[in-house]
C-alpha cells in the first residue's frame, strides 16, 4: 500500500502489477484492491532440499520471485521489494537497452555477509580500492547485485531455464539473490545506487551516497522498516535514517494519495496493479506490443 501511494505521488505513467502467494489472506487482498491494486496469485517456488542455513530464515520463500519471468504479456518489468519506496519518478528505466538485466550493486560490509571471503578480508565492490582483492584467492568475484530492485524482460525460455537450473543448484545463504547473480552474470549491467539505496551504504560508504539525488530507498537494514521502526537497533538513531523513515510514513499517512482520493486515475496514468508476495515483492510493467 505504501509503495502504491508512493508511485501515485511521483506520477508514474505506467501501471504496477503484483502477485500474491496462495496463503495471503482475503482481507489483505481486499485492502490491496481498495488501493487500486490488481492481485495476481502465483504458486511458491522452493529450492532443492538441503541443510543450507539462509542469512535470514524467510529468504527461502524468496525463490517465488522467479515466477515473474513467466509474465510474458509484458515486454519489460521493474521489480521492487515491498520494503522499498520510490521518491522520484523512475519511468525512464523502461527505456534501457533490451537484452540486459539491470540492478544496483550490493554492499558486502554488513554482518549478514560474514560467511563470504569478501567480508572476511574487508573487500567491497562499492570501494574496491580500499582493500584490494588478494591474488591468492584467485580471480576477483564478478559484480554482484542486490535483487530488491531490478529491470528485466519476461521470457518463457528464461523462466523454464531458471526453474531447471534451480533444481540442480545447491541453495546458498542469500537464496534467490545468489542464484540470480549466478544465472544472470553474463547479462547483468549495473545502474547507479540512486535506484536502490541499500541503507548500509549510509554508514559503510557515505562517500558514494548523494541523498538529495536518491530516487529509490530500500529499507532492508535491521530495524529500518518504517512500519515497525523504533530507532533502537544499531545505526537506526542516525538523523538520515530518521529522515528517510519519516518520508515513508508521510506518504503512507497521506490520505490524498489513497486510490479513492484520485478523482480520475486514468487521466493521471495511475491505474495501479500490485502483487504482494510473502517475499513482499511488487512489479511495474510495460505491456507487450499487441499482435496486431
Swiss-Prot record:
Coiled-coil regions listed: none
Keyword Magnesium in record: no
Family matches, as InterPro entries: Glyco_trans_8, GNT1/Glycosyltrans_8, Nucleotide-diphossugar_trans
Catalytic activities: myo-inositol + UDP-alpha-D-galactose = alpha-D-galactosyl-(1->3)-1D-myo-inositol + UDP + H(+)
Pfam families in the record: Glyco_transf_8 (PF01501)
UniProt binding sites for Mn(2+): 81, 83, 218
Catalytic residues (positions): 65
GO biological process: cellular response to cold; galactose metabolic process; raffinose family oligosaccharide biosynthetic process; raffinose transport
Upregulating conditions: By cold. Follows a circadian rhythm; accumulates mostly at the dark phase transition.
CC per GO annotation: cytoplasm
Family per record: Belongs to the glycosyltransferase 8 family. Galactosyltransferase subfamily.
Name the record gives this protein: Galactinol synthase 2
Organism annotation: Ajuga reptans (Bugle)
Gene that produces this protein: GOLS2
Amino acid at each position: 500500500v505504501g509503495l502504491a501511494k508512493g508511485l501515485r505521488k511521483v506520477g508514474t505513467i505506467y501501471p504496477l502489477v503484483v502477485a500474491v502467494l496462495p496463503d495471503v489472506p482475503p482481507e489483505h487482498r481486499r485492502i490491496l484492491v481498495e488501493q487500486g491494486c490488481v492481485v495476481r496469485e502465483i504458486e511458491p517456488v522452493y529450492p532443492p532440499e538441503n541443510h543450507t542455513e539462509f542469512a535470514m530464515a524467510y529468504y527461502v520463500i524468496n525463490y517465488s520471485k522467479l515466477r515473474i519471468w513467466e509474465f510474458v504479456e509484458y515486454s519489460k518489468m521493474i521489480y521492487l521489494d515491498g520494503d522499498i519506496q520510490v521518491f522520484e519518478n523512475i519511468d525512464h528505466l523502461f527505456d534501457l537497452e533490451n537484452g540486459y538485466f539491470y540492478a544496483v550493486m550490493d554492499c558486502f560490509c554488513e554482518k549478514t555477509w560474514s560467511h563470504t571471503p569478501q567480508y572476511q578480508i574487508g573487500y567491497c565492490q562499492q570501494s574496491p580500492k580500499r582493500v584490494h582483492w588478494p591474488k591468492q584467492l584467485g580471480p576477483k568475484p564478478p559484480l554482484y547485485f542486490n535483487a530488491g530492485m531490478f529491470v528485466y524482460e519476461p521470457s518463457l525460455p528464461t523462466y523454464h531455464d531458471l526453474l531447471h537450473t534451480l533444481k540442480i543448484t545447491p541453495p546458498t545463504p542469500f537464496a534467490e539473490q545468489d542464484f540470480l547473480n549466478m544465472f544472470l552474470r553474463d547479462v547483468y549491467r549495473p545502474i547507479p545506487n540512486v535506484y536502490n539505496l541499500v541503507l548500509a551504504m549510509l554508514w559503510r560508504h557515505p562517500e558514494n551516497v548523494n541523498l538529495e539525488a536518491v530516487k529509490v530507498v530500500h529499507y532492508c537494514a535491521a530495524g529500518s522498516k518504517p512500519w515497525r521502526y523504533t530507532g533502537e537497533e544499531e545505526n537506526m538513531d542516525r538523523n538520515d535514517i530518521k529522515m528517510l523513515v519519516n518520508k515513508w510514513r508521510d506518504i503512507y499517512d497521506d490520505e490524498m494519495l489513497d486510490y479513492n482520493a484520485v478523482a480520475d486515475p486514468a487521466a493521471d496514468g495511475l491505474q495501479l496493479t500490485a502483487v504482494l508476495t510473502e517475499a513482499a515483492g511488487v512489479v511495474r510493467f510495460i505491456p507487450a506490443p499487441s499482435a496486431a
